From Swiss-Prot:
GTP hydrolase that promotes the GTP-dependent binding of aminoacyl-tRNA to the A-site of ribosomes during protein biosynthesis. Its EC number is 3.6.5.3. Keywords: Cytoplasm, Elongation factor, GTP-binding, Hydrolase, Magnesium, Metal-binding, Nucleotide-binding, Protein biosynthesis. This is Elongation factor Tu.
Length: 399
């Protein structure tokens, strides 16, 4: 079949396979690319290619991730697959590869397992908007057992606040699709087609960063004689235009109001700047000593300064450059939250957890020495003595 030139005309979406090791995530990923290749929508990426995932670094942590891409009638998908359980945990916590939708792969032979639960919980905490279930290996068990597994997984999803009754559940065998002849009408591909149709219809279109309320972490502050105070940084989300009101948030509970009188990029004045742009904003009525690195410039009322929150933290192993010893309640590292570098204390650990070992992933309560702009699902790094010792994601706001 002739190669089709790739033109990005379809909406783009990031997805990924999650679930217990050996339940068939990588085989399913390969099967999707095989089926899509019949229509010129993908290059077939075999299991072996996906399995030897290249290393990537995110927030000082090394993660193995494979990216494949494919299209359907409706969308262009970038799909991630991680070989090891720890890689999934690290990816979800650092946000190295964001997921707008997740495909939970579950073997009919096992049903939900500990890693299945851990991945679903993390998907909830990092705000993965939607999930679809693929029950794999259905050729190896009785249909009654598959019904039971489906009931179990729907209960599990409901427990973690996903709409368990509405989530599409597709049943099939990824391996059978890999082994089937190259004919898209072969019955072995029916579940793969069903899964892609479910992704197209059930996964909502991602909210683009540009459509969210304006926020820019402040990287640098300087004053220009006769003009006022300029703050620089990369716009994280939203759009900004000159003449608009904004709030300066962080370092104290006081929220300072200001007006952005001009927006510049590469020494040129702009009518508007959007998410991803590196800009300088001239602030009216703010003196240089009122603004500092670590604060954020944001749309009024969109974010509040906080000191106390719960977060899921992955603690690096010694081999990853992390700590050699465990830590307990009362541990005080540095938290790198956007551009802020602030000391905080681990004030609480889950019931029954006395100490946190390198390599653990634990939800803990953190209290910072001063408030910064924080929201659920936000990523940060934990550092001590100039090295990264952990990566975290905010799971709950306390105060």
């Amino acid at each position: 079949m002739a190669k089709v030139t790739f033109v990005r005309t379809k909406p783009h979406m990031n997805v990924g396979t999650i679930g217990q090791i050996d339940h068939g995530k990588t085989t399913l990923t390969a099967a999707i690319t095989k089926y899509c290749s019949f229509f010129g929508w993908a290059d077939y990426t075999p299991y072996e290619m996906i399995d030897k995932a290249p290393e990537e670094r995110a927030r000082g942590i090394t993660i193995n991730i494979t990216h494949v891409e494919y299209q359907t009638e409706k969308r262009h998908y970038a799909h991630i697959d991680c070989p090891g359980h720890a890689d999934y945990i690290k990816n979800m916590i650092t946000g190295a590869a964001q997921m707008d939708g997740a495909i939970l792969v579950l073997a009919a032979t096992d049903g939900p397992m500990p890693q299945t639960r851990e991945h679903v919980l993390l998907a909830r905490q990092v705000n993965v908007p939607a999930m679809i279930v693929f029950i794999n290996k259905v050729d190896m068990v009785d249909p009654e057992l598959v019904d039971l597994v489906e009931m179990e997984v729907r209960d599990l999803l409901s427990k973690y606040e996903f709409p368990g009754d509405e989530v599409p559940v597709v049943r099939g065998s990824a391996l059978k699709a890999i082994e089937a002849p190259n004919d898209p009408n072969d019955p072995a591909y029916k579940p793969i087609k069903e899964l892609l149709d479910a992704m197209d219809t059930y996964f909502p279109d991602p909210v683009r960063e540009v459509d969210k309320p304006f926020l820019m972490p402040i990287e640098d502050v300087f004053s220009i004689t006769g003009r006022g105070t300029v703050v620089t940084g990369r716009i994280e989300r939203g759009v900004i235009k000159p003449g608009v009101e904004a709030e300066i948030i962080g370092m104290s509970y006081e929220i300072k109001k200001t007006v952005i009188t001009s927006v510049e990029m590469f020494r040129k004045e702009l009518d508007e700047a959007i998410a991803g742009d590196n800009v300088g904003c001239l602030l009216r009525g703010s003196s240089k000593d009122e603004v500092e690195r670590g604060q954020v410039l944001a749309k009024p009322g969109s974010i509040t300064p906080l000191k106390k929150f719960k977060a899921n933290i992955y603690v690096l192993k010694k081999e990853e450059g992390g700590r050699h010893t465990p830590f307990t309640k009362g541990y005080k590292p540095q938290f790198y939250i956007r551009t802020a570098d602030v000391t905080g204390e681990i004030v609480d650990l889950p019931a029954g957890v006395e100490m946190v070992m390198p390599g653990d992933n634990v939800e803990m309560t953190i209290e910072l020495i001063y408030p910064v702009a924080i929201e659920k699902g936000m990523r940060f790094a934990v550092r001590e003595g100039g090295r990264t010792v952990g990566a975290g994601v905010v799971s709950e706001i306390i105060e």
